[in-house]
Amino acid sequence: MPVPSKERVTELISDLVQRQGYDVEDVAVTLAGKHSAVRIMVDSDAGLELDAVANLSHEISEVFDSVSDFGESPYTLEVTSPGIDRPLTHERHWRRARGRKARIDLAHETVVGRIGALDGDSVAVVIGSRTGPDVRRIALADIQKAVVQVEFSKPDPRELELAGGIPEGRVAPADADASEDEEVVEGLDK
């Protein structure tokens, strides 16, 4: 019996993940002959800690074991946080990325700036210049694609101040980028 669909996996885990205070960001089911992989990306406003991801992985594994959807087919379960290269597609992504630098593609221009406060249907973006940083509001509907950028040096304190700082529980940009950009718990082969 094959591994269940992405939709079925999402249905099986959504309540559990939400009760633990996380959002299901994505589910990927990869069929590879007799052995398959189920990759689940989760996130929260406070970020993820490795121990919490490990516990969540074990609880998800128990849910999978309690249903017949997986049959006897072996699979690898991987629970991870979204990487830094995840596009910002939901309001919660923008909220969680406040204080981070992002590349924002609009219809006729590309803007690189520090993400500020989300206000209804627009986001504040702090754009650095020779004369100092300036804040520009951009309608979410006008954004074609936005991706957080890797930063290797500490952000300008004035830019961070104008952006509203770093959300509570999140790591400052250069500190986060210096470490791994994903936490992964692997090795739960069934």
Swiss-Prot record:
GO cellular component, one term: cytosol
Keyword terms, alphabetized: Cytoplasm, Ribosome biogenesis
PANTHER family the UniProt entry points to: RIBOSOME MATURATION FACTOR RIMP (PTHR33867:SF1)
Pfam families with a match to the protein in the record: DUF150_C (PF17384), RimP_N (PF02576)
Keyword Cytoplasm belongs to the record: yes
Physiological role: Required for maturation of 30S ribosomal subunits.
Main location: cytoplasm
Family named by the database record: Belongs to the RimP family.
Acidic residues bias spans: 177-190
Protein name (record): Ribosome maturation factor RimP
